[in-house]
Amino acid sequence: MDKKSFETVLDEIRKAVLTEYKLKAIEYVHGYFSSEQVVDLLRYFSWAEPQLKAMKALQHKMVAVHPAEVVSILSCFTFSKDKLAALELLASNIVDAQNSRPIEDLFRINMSEKKRCKRVLEQASKAGCKAPHAMISSCGTFPGNPYPKGKPSRINGIFPGTPLKKDGEEITNEGKGIAARILGPSKPPPSTYNPHKPVPYPIPPCRPHATIAPSAYNNAGLVPLANVIAPGVPPPPPYTPNPAGTDNEDLSSQSKPTQSQTFSTPASQLFSPHGSSNPSTPAATPVPAVSPAKAVNHPSVSAAATGAGMSATNTALAVFPTPQPNTPNPTVIRTPSVPATPVTSTHSTTPTPVPSVFSGLVPLPGLSATPTLPTQASSISRVTLASSETFASTCAPFSGHSSASSTAGSASNPITAPLSSVFAGLPLPFPPASHSIATPTPSVIASAAGPHGVNSPLLSALKGFLTSNDTHLINSSALPSAVTSGLASLSSLPNRNSDSPASATNKCYPPAAVPAAQRSSTPGLAMFPGLQSPVASATSVAPTLPAQSPLATPSTAVPVSCGSSGSLLHGPHAGGISSAPAAATMPVMIKSEPTSPPPSAFKGPAHPGTPVRGTLGLSGALGRGYPTTSVPISVSTCLNPALSGLSSLSTPLAGSMSLPPHASSTPIAPVFTALPPFTSLTNSFPLPGSPSLNPAVSLAGSSTTTTSAAVHPSSATVRSVLPTSNASPAAFPLNLSTAVPSLFAVTQGPLPTSNPSYPGFPVSSAPSGAPTLPSFPGLQAPSTVAVTPLPVAASAPSPAPVLPGFASAFSSNFNSALVAQAGLSSGLQAAGSSVFPGLLSLPGIPGFSQAPPQSSLQELQHSAAAQSALLQQVHSASALESYPAQADGFPSYPSTPGTPFSLQTGLSQSGWQ
């Protein structure tokens, strides 16, 4: 074939994309290829199979080849078996086949191939050469045109779906990209097309505009309040969008929690120590299904479990709660208001439900509703509620652990149980408390917390904290406290994990703000790392907890919870710790916690003792007892109780919450009294429950939603916090405030507000705070509101020291815990940072982080610290390491409930799981 024709063939082969089109380019050729051209063509076929197909196509389009040329063609093949196959195809074109020595030399190695080669060549020599000799090759063809009937690329296209080319069209693809080659020619642009003017109309000048819509999860360019990232916070509880739709909420939450649960289970088991294990397992078990939730919920649990062992309890709680109670809870949760009521109603008995409002707090007390609320984490909460009964049972299991309490709770009333559940770890206790309110609660709580194996772990974690470790103690309020605290702490420890609960809450229910809180909570928890569990509880309560994290911030936490009272509680409890107490039983826990927690966590404070007493006092006592503790709680209603350091709070809380009995409620207010504002808050939380509520209301006002917050922690909280932001937030913010805020965006709001003593409870806010502070130096911060307390906190440092130890201990384990711890402490402290300055400084406490925004926090933290905290706790994070930075920073945006945003940071720990 002449060179020009061969180039045309090669061009057709190059254009073809698929082997079958390349083969068609050969098959359509009119003409004969020389051996050298065959070797060139084979280079365009990648490996043996396509090469052999090409050989088959070339078999009848070749001029006769001599043995030496056959060798060069066969050398294009790598393996002798392919060479043999090619030889069989070439056989009829070989001239002088008798002289086959060079060909046979290619098959020296394998005897069977050598024999086959000989046989093929013998047949070829007998048959003779069928191929034309070189000079005849061009007969009947038009030189330079191997495709008289048209090029294959024109007839068939070069790729399936390619339009066929028309004559006259430029057929070359030179300079075209792969897209142009595959798509084929395109119409020329219209004459009016101006590539430099994309649209035919004038483009208006660009005005400044937001490119990302502000939402609960981000602050799109919004100016941070008080230099906190407040704006978005209160992310609504994403997961449980329907306040009313408990079921749905339940579901969403549930699933999350559930997952969490699953996750948690192990933790529970881990903690099996408390008797919980069973329950926990159950809890976990049931839930397990949901993995994510698990993360959320469980994380806390899990974490908790992990961290504390508490977790189990928590977990169980959480888990259960989650699933079940949704209904009430959700409501509660969803709606701040409702929650309270619903809670109540749900558990009617439990008016406690009111506590529900507290949700965080309440839950413990009681109310299941509350719990639900707190959980908020709606989910949890709701679970709680819904589950209330179930939960109770569940609780019972927990309770089992909780043992009496639990049982009591459970028996007492599902509600309680739910409550418990709400608290998850804590919850348990609470619930009992709630229902039992009276003692059981404590018992429950205690038991839950402590008792449970969880407790144990928890305890152990709390240990110092709980000390009361013994169930008994635990039972006692201390336990609860411890539990809570511990729980919380634990939770926090796990923090992340807890987080998860919180998170769960958080995640599940960002609303609770928990997420943030969660984080916070965790942190709060962290505060009590030991507490982790509590956290878990908290977590459940998560929202609260989160506050918890702040714990010191508890208030804040509360705020966070705020709505999340429960959470708050937790938080508080963790932070205020007392908070729980507020819850009454919880409160106790909390109460104690506050101080204790930090210390406790760190051992130092035994506050738990108080809590214990509180616990007992549960309601009354609680309230009373807690005052101090309360203080922290005070922060939010729940908080309140927690503040309770606010004591009053506590009381009210207790009353309201704990006391489900309303009586308490009333007291609550009084209790708060000191923190009047809190009181209000309290009320609000209690709100749900009772007269106290009134105060709450008032508080609420400030909190605004405190109630709501309580009610819905998330929302309210957020709201409250946020809205109140100034006031409210302040309240929470106080310590938590920041923390909270950070935890919860919502909180955040408050944070800014933080300024006031209790932003959240603006009323009390500062004043309260102050008193509070005094109450517990360490705790007080929370009470105080971040601001003032902080400083105090600073003084509190004592806790810090404690923390530090803890921290260090936890640190390795859970950064988060650490953080939390710090947070706790801090939270406790409010600034926390201050408090534990040594500790992590934790300014970073997540909750705190926001706090800083609070001025108080800042002050507390020294602005800088605060900021860093604000920043994220990051510091703490650093301290924490893993937690690192973000960690709780995100909390601000709980983001979605499920999300692990808040976790994110902590992620490291619980991991997204």
From Swiss-Prot:
Glycosylated. Interaction with OGT leads to GlcNAcylation. InterPro entries: DUF4476, PROSER1. Residues 233-291, 488-507, 592-618, 888-913 are annotated as: Disordered. Residues 251-275, 488-506, 893-913 have a biased composition (Polar residues). Keywords: Acetylation. The modification N-acetylmethionine is found at M1. Residues 276-291 have a biased composition (Low complexity). Interacts with TET2 and OGT; this interaction mediates TET2 O-GlcNAcylation and stability by promoting the interaction between OGT and TET2. Interacts with KDM6A. Interacts with TET1. Mediates OGT interaction with and O-GlcNAcylation of TET2 to control TET2 stabilization at enhancers and CpG islands (CGIs). This is Proline and serine-rich protein 1. It comes from Mus musculus. The lineage of its organism: Eukaryota, Metazoa, Chordata, Craniata, Vertebrata. The gene is Proser1.
